From Swiss-Prot:
Complexes and interactors: Part of the 30S ribosomal subunit. Forms a loose heterodimer with protein S19. Forms two bridges to the 50S subunit in the 70S ribosome.
GO MF term set: rRNA binding; structural constituent of ribosome; tRNA binding
Family of the protein in this entry: Belongs to the universal ribosomal protein uS13 family.
PANTHER family: 30S RIBOSOMAL PROTEIN S13/40S RIBOSOMAL PROTEIN S18, SMALL RIBOSOMAL SUBUNIT PROTEIN US13M
Gene: rpsM
Listed GO CC annotations: cytosol; small ribosomal subunit
Source organism of the structure: Buchnera aphidicola subsp. Cinara cedri (strain Cc)
One Pfam family it belongs to: Ribosomal_S13
Function: Located at the top of the head of the 30S subunit, it contacts several helices of the 16S rRNA. In the 70S ribosome it contacts the 23S rRNA (bridge B1a) and protein L5 of the 50S subunit (bridge B1b), connecting the 2 subunits; these bridges are implicated in subunit movement. Contacts the tRNAs in the A and P-sites.
Name this protein carries in UniProt: Small ribosomal subunit protein uS13
Keyword tags: Ribonucleoprotein, Ribosomal protein, RNA-binding, rRNA-binding, tRNA-binding
PROSITE patterns registered for this protein in UniProt: RIBOSOMAL_S13_1, RIBOSOMAL_S13_2
Region Disordered, annotated ranges: 96-119
SUPFAM superfamilies: S13-like H2TH domain
An individual GO BP term: translation
Length: 119
């Protein structure tokens, strides 16, 4: 297990897939990181040298990942709620924010149906 950005990454995975286990790094960013270091994407983590792993750590430390990214995201949502804009109100009411319909859909965002007692 290799530890990068505070996350234990399995040595058996290919580097392209292994980097996506870090919150904030997807496939495209993982490809860019591999290209900048000069590593092929189909190489497994356990075959990397210590220098390559250190260069991986240094490049990933420049990005906003894991706890910092989560904190930034919650601060942005809290800011929207504090200024009272439409998006902030939708966040506060736990409704879809981006204009989706709510009459029949949006069960994921609204949560399970509230049962109404029969008379």
């Amino acid at each position: 297990m290799t530890r990068i950005a505070g996350i234990n990454i399995s040595d058996k995975k290919h580097i392209l897939v292994a980097l996506t286990s870090i919150y904030g790094i997807g496939i495209s960013l993982s490809k860019k990181i591999c290209f900048s270091i000069g590593i092929r994407c189909d190489v497994k983590i356990n075959s990397l040298t210590k220098e390559k792993i250190e260069s991986l750590r240094s490049i990933i430390s420049k990005f906003l990942v894991e706890g910092d990214l989560r904190r930034e995201k919650t601060i942005n949502i809290k800011r929207l709620m504090d200024i009272g804009c439409y998006r902030g109100l939708r966040h506060r009411k736990h409704l879809p924010v981006r204009g989706q319909r709510t009459k029949t859909n949006a069960r994921t965002r609204k949560g399970p149906r509230k049962l109404i007692k029969s008379r």
